[in-house]
Amino acid sequence: MKTVSGKKLCGILQAKGWRSIRVHGSHHIFTKEDRDERICVPVHGNSDLKIGLQKAIMKIADIKDDDIY
């Protein structure tokens, strides 16, 4: 699995229909109208997310490995 930065994952989430509802410090909060979950993505410059956090976010958002470009 390719790791990505928080910035890039935010772009992928928006492309999948998630919208940013607010930013608290360096954490971007996303929601989707047909879902009850919220996703918090840390954006710390261009550093990659740790693999466990990235997998958890991808699982909630139904993002496949092929969607990471």
Question: What do these predicted regions represent?
Answer:
Residues 27-28, 44:
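Histidine-centered active-site/metal-ligand motif
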Residues 8, 27, 54:
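Gly/Ser/Thr-rich beta-alpha loop segments that engage phosphate groups in nucleotides
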Residues 30-34:
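Active-site beta-strand termini and strand-to-loop segments that position acidic
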Residues 35-39:
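Short, charged/polar, Gly/Pro-enriched secondary-structure boundary elements
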Residues 45-69:
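C-terminal structural segments of small proteins and small subunits
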Residues 1-24:
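N-terminal first-folded block
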